[in-house]
A protein has these predicted regions:
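Outer-membrane beta-barrel "beta-signal"
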Residues: 183-186, 214-228
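Extracellular/periplasm-exposed beta-strand and loop segments of Gram-negative cell-envelope proteins
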Residues: 38-61, 88-116, 142-175, 195-221
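Bacterial Sec-dependent N-terminal signal peptides
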Residues: 1-28, 32, 220-228
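Short loop/turn motifs that connect adjacent beta-strands in outer-membrane beta-barrel proteins
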Residues: 19-27, 75-76, 128-134
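Transmembrane beta-barrel domains of outer membrane proteins
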Residues: 69-73, 122-126, 177-181, 188, ...
Length: 228
């Protein structure tokens, strides 16, 4: 009996330490770099009552990102705060048809490059956690701030001269992602679903006209980084 009591007393601190370890909250920081491509749910332009998107060809160009982050983890669940600095690049080629031939030529193109700051807050869950190998899924809201004073736009061969798109300075998204971590190195694959429109309107300065632009962008991104 005495031996049993001694064994229980010896094992009690070990079990208590394990319990404290399971309930411990970990705070980590890291840095990641990556690239992103933009697609659109509805790349529709409207000019003088004409709308055209069915003949639109999207040329998805690559933008680049740099992001410091902080992660707070409890057991298998974590919350991650990021600040993503990056560029977005994309273009549209519009095909002229009978209904819009008075607006477009055969080689009409619109290209755009922007500088932006993205602030996501995601909640993740480590589905697989074996030693140094971890696979997780995550989701959460993202706000994108566009530095409109530094954007680069080009409208080619539109029949209205000196056109410019007035972009929204703040847009909202919802993130869905998959992460793989090996030791301190990780890879993230993310899809951002656009919730709000990215454009206010398009103006023709020479003709003093304002055109509607109705589109929400989605963002596909890949990043690699280290967490400490």
């Amino acid at each position: 009996m005495r031996s049993l009591i001694i064994c229980i007393l010896l094992l009690f601190p070990l079990s208590l330490g394990a319990q404290e370890s399971d309930n411990r909250i970990w705070v980590n920081a890291g840095l990641k770099v990556g690239f992103q491509a933009i697609t659109y749910n509805n790349p529709t332009f409207g000019i003088d009552g004409y709308t055209y998107n069915e003949n639109t060809i999207q040329s998805n160009k690559i933008g680049y990102t740099l992001a410091p982050f902080m992660r707070v983890t409890a057991k298998r669940v974590y919350v991650q705060f990021e600040t993503i600095f990056g560029t977005s690049r994309h273009s549209f080629d519009f095909k002229s048809t009978g209904s819009n031939s008075d607006l477009l030529s055969n080689t009409t193109e619109y290209s755009l490059k922007t500088l932006c700051l993205q602030v996501p807050i995601v909640i993740g869950y480590n589905m697989i956690q074996e030693g140094k190998y971890v696979m997780s899924v995550f989701t959460g809201p993202k706000t994108k701030f566009v530095f409109t004073a530094h954007d680069e736009q080009e409208f080619k061969h539109f029949k209205y001269g000196q056109m410019e798109e007035v972009l929204k300075k703040r847009c909202y998204y919802w993130d869905f992602g998959l992460g793989v971590k090996i030791g301190n190195v990780f890879f993230d694959f993310t899809y951002d679903l656009g919730i709000t429109k990215v454009s206010e309107y398009i103006i023709s300065k020479s003709e003093n006209l304002k055109f509607k632009s109705d589109r929400r962008d989605n963002i596909l991104s890949f990043s690699v980084g280290m967490i400490f």
